[in-house]
Amino acid sequence: MDQTDQTTHFGFRDVPLGEKQTLVNDVFHSVAQRYDLMNDLMSAGLHRVWKDIMINTLNPPKSDAPFALLDVAGGTGDISFRAARKAGAGFHATVCDINGDMLEVGRQRALKQYLEDKVSFVEGNAEKLAFPDRSFDAYTIAFGIRNVPQIELALAEAYRVLKHGGRFLCLEFSTVEVPGLDKLYDLFSFNVIPQLGRAVTGDAESYRYLVESIRQFPRPNAFAEMISAAGFSRVSWQTLSGGIVALHSGWRL
């Protein structure tokens, strides 16, 4: 069966597998310039806390020893910039994103923060990375893997490009665990976020997709099984903010 016969979800819609990436690209082309502002508004700034927890968990070395981070779907550079500020002189991050508009926002932000020597930007596909085997010490992906058409391929590529002893970290929206909060979260997600997107970016539909895509993503235990199936060891996860997000970890050992 080729991609013309297979289907996948795009939000709550079923679409041909080969079309999903184009649809996702259109979403991020539309919102790139206001993406970081919308993250602040949608999460009341909590995304900053979640990302800081991710980087504290990664704990990049503060020494001069070389440390190479691959930040996939990292477009505007948030994760890489945080890691660069925490790390030592040997640190370098490569931001890999399939969307050129998001990367351009990241490049401009790197210049403004004087981090252009610490963070580089490469256009590429998470399902087929253009990097040699065992070339990175860590792989991060924040709020990006649910947009990948074939998650299993992205996980296999993450494993391939990590060095022995390298760490995989994935921050992604999850399933709310707190009774009562789930209903409030749904109300906010489906009614407020698309209208907020319309007001800030002029695009409600892209944010309706983003909300729907969260509900389609596997629960933490199911996603952890996918990470293990890709070859990772010591797979674990922790939920944050009542289960709104989960931070997944795995090692190439």
UniProtKB/Swiss-Prot annotation:
Gene Ontology annotations of biological process type: aerobic respiration; menaquinone biosynthetic process; methylation
Reaction(s) this enzyme catalyzes, per UniProt: a 2-demethylmenaquinol + S-adenosyl-L-methionine = a menaquinol + S-adenosyl-L-homocysteine + H(+); a 2-methoxy-6-(all-trans-polyprenyl)benzene-1,4-diol + S-adenosyl-L-methionine = a 5-methoxy-2-methyl-3-(all-trans-polyprenyl)benzene-1,4-diol + S-adenosyl-L-homocysteine + H(+)
Residues reported to bind S-adenosyl-L-methionine: T76, D97, N125, A126
Pfam families to which the protein is assigned, alphabetical: Ubie_methyltran (PF01209)
Pathway of action: Quinol/quinone metabolism; menaquinone biosynthesis; menaquinol from 1,4-dihydroxy-2-naphthoate: step 2/2; Cofactor biosynthesis; ubiquinone biosynthesis
Enzyme class, first EC level, given as a word: transferase
Annotated EC: 2.1.1.163, 2.1.1.201
GO molecular function: 2-methoxy-6-polyprenyl-1,4-benzoquinol methyltransferase activity; demethylmenaquinone methyltransferase activity
Keywords from the UniProt entry: Menaquinone biosynthesis, Methyltransferase, S-adenosyl-L-methionine, Transferase, Ubiquinone biosynthesis
The UniProt record lists the keyword Magnesium: no
Keyword Transferase: yes
UniProt record similarity statement: Belongs to the class I-like SAM-binding methyltransferase superfamily. MenG/UbiE family.
Function: Methyltransferase required for the conversion of demethylmenaquinol (DMKH2) to menaquinol (MKH2) and the conversion of 2-polyprenyl-6-methoxy-1,4-benzoquinol (DDMQH2) to 2-polyprenyl-3-methyl-6-methoxy-1,4-benzoquinol (DMQH2).
Protein name, per record: Ubiquinone/menaquinone biosynthesis C-methyltransferase UbiE
Organism: Bradyrhizobium sp. (strain BTAi1 / ATCC BAA-1182)
